[in-house]
UniProtKB/Swiss-Prot annotation:
Homotetramer. Interacts with both DnaA and DnaN, acting as a bridge between these two proteins. Belongs to the YabA family. InterPro entries: YabA (IPR010377). Its main location: cytoplasm. Keywords: Cytoplasm, DNA replication, DNA replication inhibitor, Metal-binding, Zinc. This is Replication initiation control protein YabA. Binds 1 zinc ion per subunit. GO terms for cellular component: nucleoid. Its cofactor is Zn(2+). It comes from the Bacteria. Involved in control of chromosome replication initiation. Inhibits the cooperative binding of DnaA to the oriC region, thus negatively regulating initiation of chromosome replication. Inhibits the ability of DnaA-ATP to form a helix on DNA; does not disassemble preformed DnaA-DNA helices. Decreases the residence time of DnaA on the chromosome at its binding sites (oriC, replication forks and promoter-binding sites). Tethers DnaA to the replication machinery via the DNA polymerase beta sliding clamp subunit (dnaN). Zn(2+) binds at H86, C88, C102, C105.
Length: 115
């Protein structure tokens, strides 16, 4: 390989890398915007839930769903489950394949406990 073709190949590689870095920066910026928006929406959603609960309490409506509200620990388990992880004692912490439902996990989160 002569010096000229080596130099041209190196310039081509540099151009490709610059292009890749530019694309990576654009993707990173888009991801940052999405994470920011997601966080904002989660906070707004939580505030709206709390406001709705306050309105229901003020109205004196004690519905069946309010009586069966999940505890904070079960809500944490539910969040982990929704993120794609097992929360059952059999496969705890491992990823759910293709986000398939797990009867054991659902029982841990929503099942009746009499202890």
């Amino acid at each position: 390989m002569d010096k000229r073709s080596l130099y041209d190949g190196l310039n081509s590689l540099e151009t490709d890398l610059d292009s890749s870095v530019t694309q990576l920066r654009e993707i990173k910026a888009a991801l940052h915007e999405l994470v920011e928006k997601n966080t904002t929406l989660e906070i707004e959603n939580q505030r709206l839930r709390e406001h709705l609960q306050e309105l229901n309490k003020l109205a004196g409506n004690t519905t069946e769903t309010e009586k069966q509200e999940l505890s904070k620990s079960r809500m944490n388990l539910e969040k982990l489950y929704e993120e794609g992880f097992h929360v059952c004692n059999i496969l705890y912490g491992s990823r759910r394949e293709n986000d398939e439902e797990c009867a054991f996990c659902l029982d841990v989160i929503y099942g009746e406990r009499t202890r």
